[in-house]
């Protein structure tokens, strides 16, 4: 085997390990480098042309999460509820590497994901109730109190508030109480 072929094979093996998540890739900004540069401000896009990371929701009530991007990889766990929000952090062909609200990561086929936006109310604080307001203001009337870990559809977000709509309730909640939207993210109906 020539040296050039050996180098190509080694580089290909490293690339595959990065794509399947065996070798983590840490952005320069996470190492304290490149902050404030133009590159650090650019939106990263995946091979699909969509931004990375981004939130989506599960489109089925049974979704296998695999250890790698393919049906030949073992199932790590199974989601058993549709509409749960997950964060896409990587793409490989038709597979999406996702992260759930607990920080667990795995691969899901893109056909099992939906662009419909949902969020979980404060999953990090299971002792609390949160006011759902009639308007996007802390002084607005209270439409309902929502329990932590409640799943809700996100209709719109702007200026640190999100409008949640459900067959049981409708109103505004502070954006920082939700897992499934980014800080200051704008979501239009």
Q: Where do the language-model regions lie?
A:
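Bacterial N-terminal signal peptides
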Residues: 10-24, 29-32
């Amino acid at each position: 085997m020539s040296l050039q072929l050996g180098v190509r094979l080694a580089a290909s093996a490293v690339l595959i390990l990065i794509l399947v998540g065996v070798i983590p890739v840490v952005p320069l900004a996470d190492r304290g480098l490149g902050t404030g540069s133009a590159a650090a401000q650019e939106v990263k896009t995946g091979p699909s042309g969509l931004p990375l990371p981004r939130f989506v929701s599960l489109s089925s009530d049974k979704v296998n999460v695999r250890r790698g991007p393919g049906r030949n990889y073992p199932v790590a766990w199974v989601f058993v509820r549709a509409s749960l929000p997950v964060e896409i952090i990587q793409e490989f062909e038709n597979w999406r590497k996702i992260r759930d609200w607990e920080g667990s990561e795995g691969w899901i086929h893109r056909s099992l994901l939906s662009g419909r936006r949902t969020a979980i109310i404060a999953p990090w604080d299971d002792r609390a109730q949160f006011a759902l307001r009639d308007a996007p203001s802390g002084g607005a009337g209270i439409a309902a109190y929502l329990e932590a870990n409640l799943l809700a559809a996100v209709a719109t977000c702007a200026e640190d508030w999100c409008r949640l709509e459900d067959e049981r309730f409708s109103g505004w909640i502070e954006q920082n109480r939700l897992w499934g939207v980014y800080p200051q993210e704008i979501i239009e109906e």
